[in-house]
């Protein structure tokens, strides 16, 4: 298959979140299975900091954004970097950048301290149209376009309208992956003329959404297949609670929403070779090594060194969506009652949460170490050294930290939502007895439920050490590699192409 990935983020060229990890890795793994893959993304300023060689191609063209506005651009080219230590990472995946400085050479990808850029609708309509032209100018066949999030979600509709002629000569299948329903690209209807289409196309079955231009909704109703990043999230976004206004539309599309869990880079996240750890370990010798790593981390962050005290780790954005409205009451209760627990926190976000953590750290330095900001090395050490990882998100499309934790032998306490529900098996008596458990679910999204789940974990850890050992080792043995995810995507790509051909033939 010939597959083109459309994305605004891909490591190491541009990143604000997990989308970059997906689009920087998935195309390489798919290509390694014998498929031809390429990535097309905007030439943001950040590409110059990627340390990857970037060359100028001889391809340039203009996009008529209106009768009076012709916007020119050129294509730059690089490749997704290969890991020299991974013999399976051998496929060459070209990355083409749409270089239009007026739109894309800015300090940030989507906005600044004042909010989203005022011309985001124009910027990403241009990107969608330019990407279609680029596919034509590059000159090789395209079987499927894999669009990611709202910024590229107009492409399926534009291809159906054959606005730039490419779809008239190539029967291109389209798939849209939703990484977070909350971001939809909703703009006023006055942005529609930038698509280059007549107002006849501004209809509810394509671009129009309550007299607005909603990029994501347009992609949902015009792509051949819609996917998201976990089976549970695929179901959740079809409910009013999680659908962000598009739940009924998702329920009504011809094909069911697919859910595929993201993989993790098991070369970077590998406790056997991780250079950030005091002592490396595997599933057969983890127990003593985790104690050594724990003592080293306690010393590093200023907590009293004690191999027996339970160490609870938290990494990520400090926001209520990540469950901090639950975590803070439980944390304060543990500190006020001087419960025998230690907490280590790494993250940034809501200034009010940051300030509370600073104050609590000053008041209880023997129990809490909070680092505001981010350190990749410290994140690795927290994953490896903690006795359990706390992740009570209110919604989590996929989640990665719980997968890192499993690989590092650190059971997770999570809410039963999205990818957390799909990847963490609750330690019920039945699951523990069957050796299937990998963590602990909250009974509901409340501080009391979080405290109860933590207590369940502590009880198993300190009163049933053999069961805890089984739980840790079963978690470490799970396969969350990108190869597993890529195999599922390849099957979905083949089905999407078949569906597209049947739709075009009318069968």
Curated annotation (Swiss-Prot):
GO terms for molecular function: alpha-1,4-glucan glucosyltransferase (ADP-glucose donor) activity; alpha-1,4-glucan glucosyltransferase (UDP-glucose donor) activity. ADP-alpha-D-glucose binds at residue 15. It holds the Pfam family Glyco_transf_5. Pathway: Glycan biosynthesis; glycogen biosynthesis. It catalyses: [(1->4)-alpha-D-glucosyl](n) + ADP-alpha-D-glucose = [(1->4)-alpha-D-glucosyl](n+1) + ADP + H(+). InterPro entries: Glyco_trans_1, GS/SS, Starch_synth_cat_dom. Keywords: Glycogen biosynthesis, Glycosyltransferase, Transferase. GO terms for biological process: glycogen biosynthetic process. Its EC number is 2.4.1.21. The keyword Transferase applies. Belongs to the glycosyltransferase 1 family. Bacterial/plant glycogen synthase subfamily. Synthesizes alpha-1,4-glucan chains using ADP-glucose. PANTHER family: ALPHA AMYLASE DOMAIN-CONTAINING PROTEIN (PTHR45825:SF11), GRANULE-BOUND STARCH SYNTHASE 1, CHLOROPLASTIC/AMYLOPLASTIC (PTHR45825). This is Glycogen synthase. It comes from Rhodopirellula baltica (strain DSM 10527 / NCIMB 13988 / SH1).
């Amino acid at each position: 298959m010939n597959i083109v990935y459309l994305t605004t983020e891909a490591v190491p060229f541009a990143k604000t979140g997990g989308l970059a990890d997906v689009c920087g890795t998935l195309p390489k793994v798919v290509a390694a299975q014998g498929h031809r893959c390429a990535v097309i993304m905007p030439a943001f300023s950040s590409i110059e900091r990627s340390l990857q060689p970037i060359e100028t191609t001889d391809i340039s063209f203009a996009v008529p954004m209106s009768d009076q506005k012709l916007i020119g651009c050129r294509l730059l080219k690089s490749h997704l970097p290969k890991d020299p230590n991974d013999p399976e990472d051998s496929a060459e995946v070209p990355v083409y950048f749409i270089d239009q400085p007026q739109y894309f050479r800015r300090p940030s990808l989507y906005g600044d301290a004042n909010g989203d850029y005022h011309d985001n609708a124009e910027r990403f309509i241009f990107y969608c149209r330019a990407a279609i032209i680029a596919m034509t100018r590059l000159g090789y066949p395209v079987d499927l376009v894999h669009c990611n999030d709202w910024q590229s979600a107009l492409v399926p509709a534009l291809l159906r309208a054959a606005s730039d002629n490419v779809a008239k000569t190539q029967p291109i299948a389209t798939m849209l992956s939703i990484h977070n329903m909350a971001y939809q690209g909703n703009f006023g209807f006055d942005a529609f003329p930038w698509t280059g289409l007549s107002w006849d196309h501004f209809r509810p079955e394509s671009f129009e959404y309550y007299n607005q231009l909603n990029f994501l909704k347009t992609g949902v109703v015009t792509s051949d297949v819609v996917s998201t990043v976990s089976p549970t999230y695929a179901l959740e976004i079809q409910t009013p609670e999680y659908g962000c206004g598009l739940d009924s539309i998702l329920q009504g599309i011809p094909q069911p929403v697919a859910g595929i869990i993201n993989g993790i880079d098991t070369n970077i996240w590998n406790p056997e070779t991780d250079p950030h750890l005091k002592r490396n370990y595997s599933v057969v010798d983890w127990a003593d090594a985790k104690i050594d790593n724990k003592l080293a981390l306690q010393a590093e962050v200023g907590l009293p060194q004690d191999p027996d005290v339970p160490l609870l780790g938290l990494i990520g954005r400090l926001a209520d969506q990540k469950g901090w409205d639950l975590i803070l009451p439980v944390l304060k209760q543990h500190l006020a009652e001087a419960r025998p627990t230690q907490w280590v926190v790494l993250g940034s976000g809501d200034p009010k949460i940051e300030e509370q953590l600073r104050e609590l750290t000053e008041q209880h330095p023997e129990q809490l170490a909070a680092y505001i900001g981010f350190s990749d090395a410290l994140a690795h050490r927290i994953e490896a050294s903690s006795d359990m990882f706390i992740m009570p998100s209110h919604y989590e499309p996929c989640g990665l930290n719980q997968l890192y934790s499993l690989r590092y032998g650190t059971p997770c306490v999570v809410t039963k939502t999205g990818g957390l529900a799909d990847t963490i098996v609750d330690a019920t008596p039945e699951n523990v007895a069957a050796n299937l458990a990998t963590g602990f679910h909250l009974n509901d999204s409340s501080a009391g439920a979080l405290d109860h789940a933590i207590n369940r974990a502590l009880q198993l850890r300190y009163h049933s050490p053999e069961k805890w050992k089984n739980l840790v080792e079963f978690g470490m043995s799970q396969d969350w590699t990108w190869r597993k995810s890529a195999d599922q995507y390849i099957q979905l790509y083949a089905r999407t192409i078949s569906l597209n051909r049947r739709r075009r033939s009318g069968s």
